[in-house]
Amino acid sequence: CCRICSMGPCRITPKAPRGICGCDAHGIVGRNFLRFTAGGAATHSDHGREICITLGHAKEGGDYQVKDPEKLIRIAKEWGVETEGKDIYDLAHEMSDLAQEEYGKIRGISRWLKRAPQHTQDLWHEAGIEPRAIDREVSCALHMTHMGNTCKPEALIRQALRNGLSDGWGGSMCGTEFSDVLFGTPKPIETEANLGVMNAENVNIVVHGHDPSLSEMICEVADSKEMIDYAKSMGAKGITISGVCCTSNEVAMRRGIPMAGNF
């Protein structure tokens, strides 16, 4: 079934093997799958974009600071950026701009692809699925799947692969690497999991979502004397932070915050 245009929905049957635009069942499946992929790539990549923007606001003594300067310098060198003699925050702001350019640059492919083994890079190149600008791949996916455009499943799946790479080797890579720069690179740590981590006598705050920028600040503030005293003045014994989903992993790896879920 295809519901992409307002003349639909078109349901493919033995008597009606093509939709109003001429697309068959294979093309419709390809279109739907590509749109799913584009939605996921946009979601994760926007998480990465938010981290890149936050990096641009980091400053000495500010709410957001560079917690892993060595990693920032290492990434800068990987991207061919001069680091010698630069203030770490000037470098952070420069890298923030370069990272955001990955979302809309007008030519070239993702900088991060060079991290892959050479034979993998060659495979991507030969298959024609090297991602270009991150936002371009999402836009291209929506263009290709609109009524009257691509209905060849091979082309649609190829663009889905390119979208997936633009996320995993683009937006998500930005999110992962620059989160470590801002909040510290995780190390092995012991914590707890499941609903038993909640405390009936405390104020319970559960952080949830993709972006650690907010959850890190919640953890920071909740641990302050001012907030703990306020919770006690309201009748609680303290504040318990726990997490679910991706953000839970972020604060668990860096702070040992327990997980209210089971993964």
Show the residue positions of the predicted features.
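Metallocofactor- and cofactor-centric catalytic cores in central/energy metabolism, strongly enriched
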Residues: 1-263
